[in-house]
Design a protein with these regions (language model features):
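A short helix->loop->beta-strand "cap" motif at the edges of active sites that frequently abuts
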Residues: 29, 96, 175-179
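A transmembrane-helix-recognition feature enriched in membrane-embedded lipid enzymes
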Residues: 68, 197-252
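Conserved beta-alpha
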Residues: 67-146, 150
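Proline-aspartate-enriched helix->loop->beta-strand connector
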Residues: 147, 151-156, 161, 177
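N-terminal nucleotide/polyanion-binding subdomain common to many enzyme families
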Residues: 1-79, 84-85
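Short Gly/Thr/Asp-enriched flexible loops that form oxyanion-binding sites at enzyme active sites
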Residues: 112, 165-174
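Short, flexible loop segments at boundaries between secondary-structure elements
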Residues: 130-135, 176-213
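Short glycine-rich anion-binding loops that position phosphate/pyrophosphate groups of nucleotides
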Residues: 37-39, 159-164, 186-187
Length: 255
């Protein structure tokens, strides 16, 4: 685990999965954040939200740009591990019982149908639409009881950032077992409905944000404006932090 931009990242994909397996052998629950550019922007502006992001097990790097920034600043290689990738990896393993929370019921129904092709066990799993509420207003005790009755190991949450991360932090003290992972639009990507992830060639060339802008212009343009407005200060701060590091990061970590 390493800290960059004040966020605790786990870049080693194998260690991500090992950490999940270890956590599930112990009492209590925890959560993993899937940190993209929007989360990076929000943590820079909101220290309380930064504490939420770092209050879980760790973050995985959903942003394709953070690895570029780390190469520019530190000369190191770090892999991206997108939310849609960890979602596909865990669902296809057929290792855990899962529960899927959030999104509209239409999306959840289609998601269940599509995921069942990847993992037939999904047919017996719970897909639950959550009410449209402020994050303070959810019945966290009731949601925890539902999850524990379901005996889910992995709790997938799709409420959009920053709401879904705050949701996990508030649910954590009520939940006796499980690892929560908030994955935003990934439910939509895998549902087979309107919103899809960018083609692989765009992802490889750090152009996914362009695809997302055309898919959801009103939402994504606002996000991009926020990211661009804070990026110079964020990079400048990390350059300063580099000088204060006692140990230089290792050159490369395998994805």
């Amino acid at each position: 685990m390493e800290s960059f931009f004040n966020i605790r990242y786990e870049f080693d994909k194998n260690e991500v999965h090992n950490a999940i397996a270890r956590r599930l052998t112990k009492p209590g629950s925890d959560y993993i954040c899937v940190s993209d550019g929007n989360i990076l922007n929000n943590t820079y502006k909101d220290h309380d939200y930064l504490n939420v992001i770092n209050g879980g097990m760790f973050s995985i790097c959903d942003s394709s740009y953070v690895p570029l920034y780390l190469r520019w600043i530190y000369g190191i290689k770090r892999p991206q591990y997108a939310g849609s990738d960890i979602f596909r990896d865990i669902v296809s393993q057929r290792k855990y019982r899962m529960i899927f929370l959030g999104a509209q019921q239409k999306t959840l129904d289609s998601l269940k149908k599509e995921l069942s092709k990847m993992n037939p066990d999904v047919k017996s799993m719970t897909f639950e639409e959550l009410p449209f509420l402020d994050v303070e207003d959810f019945d966290y005790e009731g949601i925890a009881r539902m999850i524990e009755h379901d005996k889910a190991d992995i709790i997938w949450i799709s409420l959009g950032a920053p709401k879904q991360e705050r949701f996990m932090a508030k649910l954590k003290p009520h939940l006796g077992h499980g690892v929560m992972i908030a994955i935003g639009a990934t439910f939509n990507f895998f549902s087979g409905l309107d919103i899809k992830r960018a083609p692989e060639w765009m992802i490889r060339n750090h152009m996914e944000f362009i695809y997302r802008i055309f898919s959801e212009p009103s939402k994504q343009i606002k996000r991009c404006q926020g990211i661009i407005s804070t990026l110079p200060a964020l990079l400048r701060r990390e350059y300063t932090n580099k000088k204060n590091r006692k140990e230089r990061p290792v050159k490369e970590i395998a994805g």
